[in-house]
């Protein structure tokens, strides 16, 4: 028997390429042959993504819209009184009426109201004038009192100065007489000694 030759396979992919009938790896025929076997549908994924979202997401959207649509009322609309505020009766706005407008039916009542307001204002002005006059009188009285005190102090100072001068004059005359008498007697020198002060 003759020895049979075996073909050595150098490349694993060589047998595949040999089956296709071409030696080139990335040929079009190879890709066609592989794709011819199985066909996949890609339309299903596209329809799912383009279609409507599932039901649980819809419910979530509805809840979000309900929360957004809820109206928030202000304190004014709810009629809550504002705290820490003292509002006079005239300033407070009654519901359904205009603030600060009082309509009078007859002219006489309007004139009486006007007269009352004017009298009140005049009284306030008069009281201010009276107060100003009183303050002026008080100021004048204080001024007069201050001047009187100053004059008294000046008179007192003048009196004290006069007394001191008189005492000095009297004291000087007495000393002069004593010096003259002693000079005649000879016990003391004619000129009196001057006082000297020495500082250390």
From Swiss-Prot:
One GO BP annotation of this record: ribosomal large subunit biogenesis
Any GO MF annotation of the entry: mRNA binding
Principal localisation: nucleus
Ranges of biased composition (kind: Polar residues): 1-12, 23-38
Compartments, as annotated in UniProt: Nucleus, Nucleolus
Coiled-coil ranges per UniProt: 130-170
Biased composition (Basic residues): 190-200
Region listing for Disordered, in residue ranges: 1-73, 138-200
Gene Ontology CC terms: nucleolus; preribosome, large subunit precursor
Basic and acidic residues biased stretches: 138-180
First and last residue of the signal peptide: none
Domain of life: Eukaryota
Keywords: Coiled coil, mRNA transport, Nucleus, Ribosome biogenesis, Transport
Record's subunit section: Component of the 66S pre-ribosomal particle.
Free-text function comment from the UniProt entry: Required for efficient assembly and nuclear export of the 60S ribosomal subunit.
Family from the record: Belongs to the LOC1 family.
Designated name of the protein: 60S ribosomal subunit assembly/export protein loc1
Originating organism: Sclerotinia sclerotiorum (strain ATCC 18683 / 1980 / Ss-1) (White mold)
Organism lineage string: Eukaryota, Fungi, Dikarya, Ascomycota, Pezizomycotina
Name of the gene this protein is made from: loc1
